[in-house]
């Protein structure tokens, strides 16, 4: 009899006002018993207590909470996840961009993004083909995406390779350095940065990266 390996869904980052974890927790609750999944939630923030409360309410036994890790351990942590969760609440487009998407791409892992359909992270996931974009509250689609990724090793591998390729093409060191040089040259040529008004937004969301 073939042993089905345990697959880890990783969420690493802030449990903040702009992040949405309810959908994925309800999706995990709905999974069939043959889906061998553990969920690792790493980080802290204002939403952590509510997340713990919901886990307890749903009686989820395959959830593990861990405190934030120091920066030098971050790459190892990201590599430990087989699937990565990135989340963003509805109506936060233009206010926050969950930076964890870039770390996920850099370690070549498939992504489940739960958030607005039209935002930077959704565009990255679609353009790269590295995962699924799911609207907040769509528990059925989230559960289906989890099942597919847990049960299909080839799909995880393919989406992970796409993530790594997209990261190298769009956000690799050479590309990033070239962008920085381009910005510096533009500023030097113009003598100043374009002045743009900064919108006033909720402080909690402003700190939510």
Predicted segment positions?
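Nucleotide-sugar-dependent
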Residues: 19, 68-79, 84-105, 110-123
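A short, well-ordered alpha-helix in the C-terminal region of glycosyltransferases
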Residues: 141-144, 148, 155-169
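Amphipathic alpha-helical segment in the mid-to-C-terminal domain
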Residues: 71, 139, 156, 169-177
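Conserved acidic donor-binding segment of nucleotide-sugar-dependent glycosyltransferases
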Residues: 116, 127, 132-139, 148-154
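C-terminal alpha-helical cap of glycosyltransferases
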Residues: 173-209
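Nucleotide-activated donor-binding/catalytic signature segment of Leloir-type glycosyltransferases, i.e.
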Residues: 6, 36, 40-43, 48-75
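Conserved donor-binding/catalytic core segment of Leloir-type glycosyltransferases
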Residues: 2-19, 25-28, 40
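Conserved donor-binding loops in enzymes that form glycosidic bonds
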Residues: 11-16, 44, 67-68, 170
């Amino acid at each position: 009899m073939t042993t089905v390996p345990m697959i880890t869904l990783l969420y690493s980052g802030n449990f903040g006002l702009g992040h949405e974890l309810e959908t994925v927790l309800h999706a995990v609750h709905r999974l069939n018993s043959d889906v061998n999944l553990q969920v690792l939630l790493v980080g802290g923030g204002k939403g952590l207590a509510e997340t713990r409360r919901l886990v307890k309410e749903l009686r989820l036994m395959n959830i593990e909470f861990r405190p934030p890790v120091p920066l030098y351990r971050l790459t190892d942590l990201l590599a430990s996840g087989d699937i990565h969760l990135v989340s963003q609440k509805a109506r936060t487009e233009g206010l926050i961009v969950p930076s964890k998407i870039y770390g996920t791409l850099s370690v070549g892992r498939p992504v489940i993004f739960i958030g607005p359909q039209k935002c930077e992270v959704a565009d990255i996931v679609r353009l790269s083909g590295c995962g699924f974009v799911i609207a907040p509250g769509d528990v059925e689609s989230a559960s289906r995406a989890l099942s597919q990724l847990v049960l299909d090793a080839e799909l995880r591998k393919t989406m992970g390779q796409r993530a790594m390729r997209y990261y190298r093409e769009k956000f690799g060191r050479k590309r990033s350095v070239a962008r920085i040089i381009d910005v510096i040259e533009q500023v030097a040529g113009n003598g100043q940065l374009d002045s743009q008004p900064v919108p006033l937004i909720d402080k909690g969301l402003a700190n939510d990266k």
